[in-house]
C-alpha cells in the first residue's frame, strides 16, 4: 500500500512540475523559438534529412534532436507544450534511468525513488528539462550510455557483455546525431578512472569494438544521406561547431576555468546542503566500485568542460544524474546517523526564499529602485514572485520540523517556481524575449504583410513560428544564419541597411512591408536610418514599422 502511495505522489509531482504549468510559459528567444521553428519547418516540408531555419540551411547541430522536437509538435500541435514535449519526455526518461541504475547499485526501492525525485527537482535539471533546447536529449543519451557500459561490465556472460557494448554504441551514435562528437568524448572520459581503478582493461579492449561498430552503423544512414544532399555539412559541423566552439581562442561562450563552480552551487538547489557530504562520502568510499563509477561520472565531464574554452551551464547536465544518486545515498545515511547536513539544507532553502522575497521587494514598484523591474499595473506578477520564494522558504522550514523524516519535502521548494514563474515574468522582459507576446499585440498588422524583415534571428524564428511562415528576411544582421545565407539559393533573404531604401522602392507595390527592429529601451526610433514609415508601433524593445503600397 505504501508503494502505491509513493507512486501516486511521484506522478502528482511530475504533473505539477513537468506537465500542468508548461503551456503557461511563452517561448523564449533565441533558443526556444529557433528549435520550435526548425521542427515546424521539418514537419511542413517533410525534409527529415537536412535541417532548415527560415528556409535556410542550418548546420549548427545534427538531426536527431529536431526529429524528437518535430514528433512533439506533431503529437501535441504547434503550441508551447508541443514545442517542449520532447525535452520533457527526454528528462523523464533520464529520471527513469536514474531509478533503474540506483536500484541496480543498491537494491533499495526507497533510495531509487528519492534519487529520482532529487534529480527531477534539481534547479538546473528543471530549468533545462522544461526548456526547448537539445541538451536534455544529449543528457539522456549520455546517461543511457553510462548505464549501458555498467550493464556490460557487470555481465557474467559474453552475450551479456556484447549486448551491453552494442547498446552503448547505439546511445553514443544517437548522441552524435543529437549534438555531435562530444557524445563520444564524454562517456570515454567518464569511465576511464573506473576502468583503471578496477583493472577492467581486458573487457574494454575485447568488447569495445562492438560499441564502435554499433555507433558507426547508427550514424551511417543519416550521415551518408546528408553528405549526399549537402557535401559541406560534415566539414562545417566538425571544424566550426566543434573545434572553433570549444578549443580555439575565438571559441563561443568563452568563460574562465572556475565557471562551473557557481553553476553547480545554484544548480544543486534545493539540495545544496547535501552536495559537500555526497562528494566527500563518495570519495571516502572510493573502494566501492559503484561509488567510484558515480564519482567519475560526475567529476570527469566537469573537468573536461572546465578546460574547454567555450562553456555553457547546459553542457554539464548529465553530471547531475550521478550526483542525484550520490546525494540520495548520502541523505539516507545522514538521516540515520547525523542529520546535520539535512538541517543545513533546510536553512539554505529558508535563506534562499527569504533573500528572494527581499530582492523581489527591492525591484518591485514599491521598492527603492528608480526603474523597477515590474510596473505598478503588474502588481499581481510581484505577488506571484513573492509566492514563489515564500513557498521555497516554507518548505525549507517544514523540512526542519522533523528533519529525519521530513527532509525529502525539500523537493517541493521549487513548486511555486514551477507553477507561477510563467505568470511572474515582467512585461519589459516579455516584450524583448517573448516574440509571441509581440505577435499577440501586433497580430492585425503582421498578418497581412507581404514581406517581414527583422534584425534578430531569435525574433525572426519567433515570428516565423507564430505566423506559420518561413520567409522572414534578415535585415542588417545575419547572426547564426550567416552560413546558410552564403548559398546562391538564399539570395534575397538578407537586406543590408544601405540597401534597404532601394529594396523598399522595388518591392513596395507588391504589398505591405513590415520591419521589426530590436531597439534599446531609451533609443529614439525617430533617429533610425530608415525611410519615413506609414505606421510605427513600439512595444518597448521591439518596434513594428510598416510601409504600405503607394
Swiss-Prot record:
Q: Name one GO molecular function term.
A: mannosyltransferase activity
The UniProt entry's GO biological process terms, in alphabetical order, are:
lipid A biosynthetic process; lipopolysaccharide biosynthetic process; protein O-linked glycosylation; response to iron(III) ion
Looking at the UniProt entry, the stretches that span the membrane are 7-27, 81-101, 110-131, 137-154, 165-185, 204-224, 255-275, 288-308, 315-335, 346-366, 383-403, 406-426
Q: Which UniProt keywords apply?
A: Cell inner membrane, Cell membrane, Glycosyltransferase, Lipid A biosynthesis, Lipid biosynthesis, Lipid metabolism, Lipopolysaccharide biosynthesis, Membrane, Transferase, Transmembrane, Transmembrane helix
User: E.C. number, please?
Assistant: 2.4.2.43
Q: How does it sit in the membrane?
A: Multi-pass membrane protein
Domain of life according to the entry: Bacteria
Where is it chiefly localized?
A: membrane
The subcellular localization recorded is: Cell inner membrane
Which reactions are catalysed by this chain? 4-amino-4-deoxy-alpha-L-arabinopyranosyl di-trans,octa-cis-undecaprenyl phosphate + lipid IVA = lipid IIA + di-trans,octa-cis-undecaprenyl phosphate
**Pathway, per record:** Lipopolysaccharide metabolism; 4-amino-4-deoxy-beta-L-arabinose-lipid A biosynthesis
Protein induction: Induced by BasR.
Q: Does the keyword Lipid biosynthesis apply?
A: yes
> What InterPro entries does the record tag this protein with?
ArnT_tfrase, Glyco_trans_39/83, LipidA_mod_glycosyltrf_83
Q: Which GO terms describe its cellular component?
A: plasma membrane
Enzyme class, UniProt record, top EC level: transferase
Pfam families membership: PMT
Describe its function: Catalyzes the transfer of the L-Ara4N moiety of the glycolipid undecaprenyl phosphate-alpha-L-Ara4N to lipid A. The modified arabinose is attached to lipid A and is required for resistance to polymyxin and cationic antimicrobial peptides.
Family membership noted in the UniProt record: Belongs to the glycosyltransferase 83 family.
Which HAMAP family does the record associate with it?
Answer: ArnT_transfer
Q: What is this protein called?
A: Undecaprenyl phosphate-alpha-4-amino-4-deoxy-L-arabinose arabinosyl transferase
Provenance organism: Escherichia coli (strain K12)
Q: Which gene encodes it?
A: arnT
Amino acid at each position: 500500500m505504501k508503494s502505491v502511495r509513493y507512486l501516486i505522489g511521484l506522478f502528482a509531482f511530475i504533473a505539477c512540475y513537468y506537465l500542468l504549468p508548461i503551456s503557461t510559459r511563452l517561448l523564449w528567444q533565441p533558443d526556444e523559438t529557433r528549435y520550435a521553428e526548425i521542427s515546424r519547418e521539418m514537419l511542413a516540408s517533410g525534409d527529415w534529412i537536412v535541417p532548415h531555419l527560415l528556409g535556410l540551411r542550418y548546420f549548427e547541430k545534427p538531426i536527431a534532436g529536431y526529429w524528437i522536437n518535430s514528433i512533439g509538435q506533431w503529437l501535441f500541435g504547434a503550441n508551447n507544450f508541443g514545442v517542449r514535449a520532447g525535452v520533457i519526455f527526454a528528462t523523464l526518461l533520464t529520471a527513469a534511468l536514474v531509478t533503474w541504475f540506483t536500484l541496480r547499485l543498491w537494491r533499495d526501492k526507497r533510495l531509487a525513488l528519492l534519487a529520482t525525485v532529487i534529480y527531477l527537482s534539481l534547479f538546473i535539471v528543471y530549468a533545462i528539462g522544461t526548456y526547448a533546447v537539445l541538451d536534455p536529449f544529449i543528457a539522456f543519451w549520455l546517461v543511457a550510455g553510462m548505464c549501458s557500459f555498467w550493464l556490460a561490465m557487470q555481465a557474467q556472460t559474453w552475450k551479456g557483455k556484447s549486448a551491453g557494448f552494442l547498446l552503448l554504441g547505439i546511445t553514443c551514435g544517437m548522441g552524435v546525431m543529437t549534438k555531435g562528437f562530444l557524445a563520444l568524448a564524454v562517456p570515454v572520459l567518464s569511465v576511464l578512472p573506473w576502468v583503471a581503478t578496477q583493472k577492467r582493461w581486458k573487457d574494454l579492449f575485447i568488447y569495445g569494438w562492438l560499441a564502435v561498430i554499433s555507433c558507426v552503423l547508427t550514424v551511417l544512414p543519416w550521415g551518408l544521406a546528408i553528405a549526399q544532399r549537402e557535401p559541406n555539412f560534415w566539414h562545417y559541423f566538425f571544424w566550426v561547431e566543434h573545434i572553433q566552439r570549444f578549443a580555439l581562442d575565438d571559441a563561443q561562450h568563452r568563460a574562465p576555468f572556475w565557471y562551473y563552480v557557481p553553476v553547480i552551487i545554484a544548480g544543486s538547489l534545493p539540495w545544496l546542503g547535501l552536495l559537500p557530504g555526497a562528494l566527500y562520502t563518495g570519495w571516502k568510499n572510493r573502494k566501492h566500485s559503484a561509488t567510484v563509477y558515480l564519482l567519475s561520472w560526475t567529476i570527469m565531464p566537469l573537468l573536461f568542460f572546465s578546460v574547454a574554452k567555450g562553456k555553457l551551464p547546459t553542457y554539464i547536465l548529465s553530471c547531475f544524474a550521478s550526483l542525484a544518486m550520490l546525494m540520495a545515498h548520502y541523505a539516507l545515511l545522514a538521516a540515520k546517523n547525523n542529520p546535520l547536513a539535512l538541517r543545513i539544507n533546510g536553512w539554505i532553502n529558508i535563506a534562499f526564499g527569504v533573500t528572494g522575497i527581499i530582492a523581489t521587494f527591492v525591484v518591485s514598484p514599491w521598492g527603492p529602485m528608480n526603474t523597477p523591474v515590474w510596473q505598478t499595473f503588474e502588481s499581481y506578477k510581484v505577488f506571484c514572485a513573492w509566492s514563489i520564494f515564500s513557498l521555497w522558504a516554507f518548505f525549507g522550514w517544514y523540512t526542519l520540523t522533523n528533519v529525519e523524516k521530513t527532509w525529502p519535502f525539500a523537493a517541493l521548494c521549487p513548486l511555486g517556481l514551477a507553477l507561477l514563474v510563467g505568470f511572474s515574468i515582467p512585461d519589459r522582459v516579455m516584450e524583448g524575449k517573448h516574440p509571441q507576446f509581440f505577435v499577440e499585440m501586433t497580430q492585425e498588422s503582421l498578418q497581412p504583410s507581404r514581406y517581414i524583415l527583422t534584425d534578430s534571428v531569435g525574433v525572426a524564428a519567433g515570428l516565423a513560428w507564430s505566423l506559420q511562415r518561413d520567409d522572414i528576411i534578415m535585415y542588417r544582421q545575419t547572426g547564426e544564419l550567416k552560413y546558410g545565407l552564403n548559398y546562391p539559393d538564399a539570395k534575397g533573404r538578407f537586406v543590408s541597411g544601405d540597401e534597404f531604401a532601394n529594396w523598399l522602392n522595388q518591392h513596395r507595390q507588391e504589398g505591405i512591408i513590415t520591419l521589426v527592429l530590436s531597439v534599446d529601451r531609451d533609443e529614439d526610433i525617430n533617429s533610425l536610418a530608415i525611410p519615413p514609415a506609414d505606421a510605427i508601433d513600439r512595444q518597448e524593445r521591439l518596434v513594428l514599422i510598416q510601409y504600405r503600397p503607394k
